[in-house]
Amino acid sequence: MNNSFTLKQQWFGNIRKDILAGILVALALIPEAIGFSIIAGVDPMVGLYASFCIAIIISIFGGRPGMISAATGSMAVVMVSLVADHGLQYLFAATILTGIIQVILGISKIARLMKFIPRSVMIGFVNALAILIFSAQLPQFEGASWSMYAMLAGSLVIIYVLPRFTTAVPSPLVAIIVMTIIAVTFHVDVRTVGDMGNISSSLPHFLIPDVPFTFETLQIIFPYSIALAFVGLLESLLTAQIIDEMTDTDSDKNKESRGQGIANIVTGFFGGMAGCAMIGQSVINTKAGGRGRLSAFVAGAFLMFLIAVLSHVVVKIPMAALVAVMVMVSVGTFDWSSLKGLKKAPLTDSIVMVVTVVTVVVTDDLSKGVFVGVLLSAVFFVAKISKLKIVSHAEDQKLRTYQVKGQIFFASVTDLTNAFIYQEDIERVVIDLTEAHVWDDSGAAALDKIVAKFKEQGIEAELKGLNKASKSLMKQMA
């Protein structure tokens, strides 16, 4: 990949496209933020304030230019019971603590753990997210009139056909503007952004959560904050990796982790809910040409401008146009080549990808899908490397040599122990471990057990060819 942009390039190297992409993202953020607020059981303005604050702060402190962060559904799901049981002020306190935890994790270089997520899990994550984005649009069609479908079709035509003639302005932005003008001019009876929830023109202001500063409060919010911190970082770092690949650039994921934390701390003090990177909006931004920090900054700033100044216009935007944008995102996000790859890839990789997708879709939780995928990959990997190759041959009537090739650890010791002939009319056995490695106490104990079993039969057993690390472990466990 190319080297990361300089700070100047990150802000001003792509001004026109970053501004236009940011405007498009701001428009697409509104129904998302409102919808996620409803999921969390809070006022729509809480999600909108969060999206504004997080987008602005992450544009400054984040480690992945061009990535969009705001209020998200995965975070909203975690908050539901906290809001229901303890109220909004505890949510603000939990959001601040979430940010503090994320900053600490960022300083601890948590992003290093990303290397343990296999490609098959990444592909499963992306495909599952595409399915979730698409399925999230389906409720908009319940009881919809023909005009809804007509505007959806018209929006999709603009989105996919306009780029053939010009790319000066993002086609999804043109689709939203054109459909809004048509809906307002001809009084088309379609569902609008205003139907999603009440949007006031008030700006966020600084506040300190009205909760007791006691250990009991910490006991209440800490479990939620831990969950929010890890879910947020997982989704953010995976999204950063995807945008890295889409743009062929590098990102500083530890800086991104710290940036997410700072953004959530600020958000909590301004009446917002915890958020993280949004892959859907990030893909919209990337496909619209957004590459720099300016795109995220414009998205946050324009979102607040829309709320504070143009809320009377925003509420008239037809949902059909925004649904069309999200359909475009879901189609563009899905890795269609992975379907062909199912037959070509190793069976275990295909199983991991499919299981990851199914887990996410069934649970509606990206973090659970990734966890199951990584766990399954680990099981398959352990099964693969636990296979030992053991060859034996008799040197003479008194000596037999065993050559062991492979990894000796907890998963391979049963096969190892059963591979030897303990009752044989010989005097001496040599176990050649030149091409083997002892990894843990299970492996060391198994070798000791093998030697002891030969000794019980009056046969002398010698371990030969242990490498330095294996020999050290054997001495340590003796």
Swiss-Prot record:
GO terms for cellular component: plasma membrane. It is found in: Cell membrane. Pfam families: STAS, Sulfate_transp. The chain crosses the membrane at residues 19-39, 42-62, 65-85, 87-107, 121-141, 143-163, 168-188, 220-240, 259-279, 295-315, 345-365, 366-386. Residues 389-478 form the STAS domain. Keywords: Cell membrane, Membrane, Transmembrane, Transmembrane helix, Transport. GO terms for molecular function: secondary active sulfate transmembrane transporter activity. Belongs to the SLC26A/SulP transporter (TC 2.A.53) family. This is Putative sulfate transporter YbaR. It comes from Bacillus subtilis (strain 168). The gene is ybaR.
